[in-house]
Amino acid sequence: MQLIMKTDSLEIPKIHFDEKGELIIVASASSSKDDFDFFQGKSVIRNKKLKKRFVNSNEWIEFPSTQEMYKILNGIGNIDNFLATFDEEPFEGMTVRLFNPKTKLWSIYWADSTSGTLDKPVVGSFENKVGHFFSKDIFEGKNVIQVFRWDARDENNPVWSQAMSDDKGKNWEWNWFMYMSKTN
């Protein structure tokens, strides 16, 4: 089930669960409210999204989009707007990211013009300019764990990617890559 892209040379950190089966997420020592500063401003994006998930598909859909991020809440949060066109219809997404100064963890929430709801957050932190953010979720009736990865090692061309696991993190299927280029 694991799909490795050429751009994906980073390992997903091993995940751990408590006695109730909940994810244990601990912030890195370097986690900071400034971790997303690289993303501030406008970007153009080349998206590569898996057409179907969990069917061993190798068929990808590619499309352009734009995104603009700005800080909120005196720097412990940020918001971005994601604009694209799917099937000749306008699509808008919005991300809210909040940094908890006590736990040093980021919570990332997503909403879009299709669902009109705020998704459960993915939670995590950055280490060495790479962030991993996890959550338990349900995808088409399956219990899954999802991970968002932010790779900011090249701050002018960051890469966001998403993977899901239906076997508690033993195997991951990458299903979306966003290759960004800063425009300001």
Spans of model-derived segments:
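Hydrophobic small-molecule pocket/channel-lining residues, especially in calycin-type beta-barrels
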Residues: L3-N184
